[in-house]
């Protein structure tokens, strides 16, 4: 499956070392303010080569909007966008046409399809996620018009053994202020940890936290399209994701409590944070929080003497997680509008 969503649909295409990566967004209503500059801003946050802790692959990731937008507004027709690959070094992967890399999808894709592109991982490369960021930028443009109070912010909450102490209120500008996208006092230490792993030819995993504010009450499509299920499906489809939790680590710690304490109502009447912003599969109006866990990258520089790789994908995965969340919210909003909800 290369298409995500029901009414607001994203189809991604392209291989890591092919001519281009691309996205086709269908179902976006007409009249939504959208420019190439908006999409480019999103792509720049995911772009490789941002700092010493990311891959050295030098890609400008300049987006071209081919259709669906005229005079700064969507037409209601399919929106096609491409990013040309400019710095692929396919010769680095010539040996992989005959052998499979440990920890990668090479062997299973060969078994499944009987034919694959070994250059840079082909379709399984993390480079595919730039197409998701394009789709997420369009989704955010729609949300800005339809649900202007919605704000989604993600940040690196843990790298290896180091957890981040983030403030209660965050903006993307605060998150992006440090190359690690760790908005806490641990940022410098985490940067040193990633650089040490890079120097040793090793890699690191960790977690990304997400907070969504301004959601209306009732967003979701029970029973199989619950908000929690749709978000989990969206972020679990990102390569290297190994788990999702709701409400943060503090909520996991409270699972040991008896129900009388766990479900105790707050004095101010606001839904308890233990629900993570979701009850009965629907948004409850409180901030929605989740945490997405990533395994360490499988390509280790200590073993792979050729090719270019991130020692830790978390800083560049932040905008990818935000994009997948926005795609879900945009799709569920259109479903809300399309289906009757009152007798």
Name what the model sees in each region:
Residues 1-343:
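Generic N-terminal targeting/processing segments that precede catalytic cores or assembly contacts
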């Amino acid at each position: 499956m290369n298409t995500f969503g029901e009414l607001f649909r994203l189809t991604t295409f392209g291989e890591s070392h092919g001519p281009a990566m691309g996205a086709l967004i269908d179902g976006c209503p007409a009249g939504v303010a959208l420019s190439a500059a908006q999409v480019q801003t999103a792509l720049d946050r995911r772009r490789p080569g941002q700092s010493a802790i990311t891959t050295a692959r030098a890609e400008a990731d300049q987006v071209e909007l081919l259709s669906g937008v005229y005079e700064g507004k969507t037409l209601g027709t399919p929106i096609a966008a491409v990013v040309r690959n400019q710095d692929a070094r396919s010769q680095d992967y010539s040996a992989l046409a005959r052998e499979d890399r440990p920890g990668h999808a090479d062997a299973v894709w060969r078994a499944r399809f009987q034919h694959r592109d070994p250059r840079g991982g082909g379709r399984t490369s993390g480079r595919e996620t730039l197409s998701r960021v394009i789709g997420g930028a369009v989704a955010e443009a729609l949300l800005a018009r339809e649900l202007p109070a919605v704000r989604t912010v993600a940040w690196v909450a843990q790298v290896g053994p180091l957890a981040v102490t983030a403030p209660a209120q965050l903006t993307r500008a605060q998150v992006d202020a440090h190359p690690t996208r760790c908005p806490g006092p641990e940022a410098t230490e985490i940067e040193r940890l990633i650089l040490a792993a890079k120097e040793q030819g090793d890699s690191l995993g960790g977690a990304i936290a997400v907070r969504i504010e301004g959601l209306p009450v009732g967003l979701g499509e029970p029973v199989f399209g619950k908000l929690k299920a749709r978000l989990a499906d969206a972020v679990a489809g990102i390569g290297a994701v190994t788990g999702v939790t709701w409400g943060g680590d503090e909520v996991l710690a409270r699972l040991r409590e008896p129900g009388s304490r766990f479900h105790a109502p707050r004095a101010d009447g606001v839904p308890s944070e233990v629900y993570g912003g979701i009850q009965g599969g629907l948004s409850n109006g409180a901030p929605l929080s989740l945490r997405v866990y990533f395994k360490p990258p499988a390509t280790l520089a200590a073993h792979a003497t050729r090719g270019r790789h991130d020692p830790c994908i978390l800083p560049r995965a932040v905008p990818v997680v935000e994009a997948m969340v926005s795609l879900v919210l945009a799709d569920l909003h259109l479903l809300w509008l399309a289906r009757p909800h009152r007798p």
